[in-house]
Amino acid sequence: MRFWLDGGHNPAAGRAIAATLATLPKRDTHIICGMLNTKDVTGFLAPIAAHCASLTTVTIPNEVNAVSSADLAEVGRSCAIPSREASDVHAALQDLSQRHPQARILICGSLYLAGHVLRENEPST
């Protein structure tokens, strides 16, 4: 399993991610996404839809403006992406790694989410 972390969160980032995914060797890509309600969620997800096998949504921890994982999954479904919710990024990674061990996993949708993932995975000193 390979996983990537990207802070992209707007339509231009969605298009850039889609363009990059289109150039990569064939492999299922599963997205873990959390976003803020101040962003264009559909505009971000729509370009990516053709390049991902599934979307797992999370609510960004400790962010008052976070889109709920349920609402984010609904937008994913409206973009024709098979979508499910997870309690957090760790649970999403565990689930995807068990079900799709050879997959590419992209965590994206917010700089706040990216920061959270990086803080959670800092080596202890």
Summary of predicted features, one role per range:
Residues 24-28, 77-80, 125:
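Short helix-capping segments at alpha-helix termini
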Residues 115-125:
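Active-site-adjacent alpha-helix immediately C-terminal to a catalytic or transition-state-stabilizing loop
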Residues 1-54:
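Nucleotide phosphate-binding/pyrophosphate-handling subdomain across enzymes
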Residues 13, 40-41, 64-66, 93-95, ...:
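Short active-site-adjacent structural elements
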